[in-house]
């Protein structure tokens, strides 16, 4: 009985998240109500509150899940890099490709960029920046990157990725190759100039 109950709980939570993804994409965060989300499910209206206290909580859950998966893919791509170019290019390409690959997630992000950045950035930014800093230190130690100020570099690379990702989401069609090439060229140039100044 316990196993069935857990499966039901997991299915209900997944149904709420899937419905919320669609509604937030269509209406945007500000115009969406809990009632709008529940209407897209087969659940009773009170069931929502067994899983989330309000729309903020379900929105945050979507942002966190998206951020977790994006970080996993980006980090996996970066760790296979053996040169500075591979390190920068692979991370940005993995991130930009992730943004556009799922139409529902892409629509959600496209409709809620400002809300994600302004109200829920704390759900994803610190962890992503710290992971990038760790990977930068490892790449420097392995000789794949010249020594840099890791804190500055990590924050700058994350900021550029987020801003270009936002612009990517606004373009039709989204240009993953163009965004990747621009970000890679920008940081390779900066890394090369920095390497020359510290020699």
Task: Explain the meaning of each model-derived region.
Residues 1-27, 31-43, 57:
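Basic, helix-initiating cap at the start of DNA-binding domains
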Residues 3, 97-101, 130-141, 158-160, ...:
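C-terminal peripheral helix-coil segments that are non-catalytic and often amphipathic
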Residues 41-52:
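Short hydrophobic/aromatic patch on the recognition helix
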Residues 52, 59-66, 109:
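Alpha-helical DNA-contacting segments of helix-turn-helix folds
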Residues 56-58, 104:
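A secondary-structure capping/hinge motif
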Residues 61, 72-101, 157, 180:
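Hydrophobic alpha-helical connector segments
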Residues 68-71, 117-142, 151-155, 178:
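Amphipathic alpha-helical packing segments from all-alpha helical-bundle domains
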Residues 75-77, 109-116:
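Short linear capping/connector segments at secondary-structure termini
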């Amino acid at each position: 009985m316990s196993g069935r109950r857990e499966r039901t709980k997991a299915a209900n939570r997944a149904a709420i998240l899937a419905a919320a993804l669609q509604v937030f994409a269509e209406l945007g965060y500000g115009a969406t109500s809990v009632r709008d989300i529940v209407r897209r499910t087969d659940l009773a209206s009170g069931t929502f509150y067994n899983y989330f206290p309000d729309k903020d909580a379900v929105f945050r859950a979507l942002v966190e899940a998206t951020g977790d998966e994006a970080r996993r893919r980006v980090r996996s791509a970066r760790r296979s890099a053996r040169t500075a170019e591979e390190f920068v290019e692979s991370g940005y390409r993995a991130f930009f490709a992730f943004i556009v690959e799922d139409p529902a997630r892409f629509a959600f992000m496209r409709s809620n960029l400002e809300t994600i950045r302004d109200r829920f950035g704390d759900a994803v930014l610190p962890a992503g920046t710290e992971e990038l800093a760790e990977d930068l230190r490892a790449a420097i130690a392995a000789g794949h990157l010249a020594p840099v100020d890791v804190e500055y570099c990590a924050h700058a690379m994350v900021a550029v990725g987020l801003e270009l990702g936002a612009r990517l989401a606004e373009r039709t069609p989204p240009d993953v190759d163009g965004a990747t090439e621009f970000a890679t060229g920008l940081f390779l140039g900066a890394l090369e100039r920095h390497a020359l100044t510290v020699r």
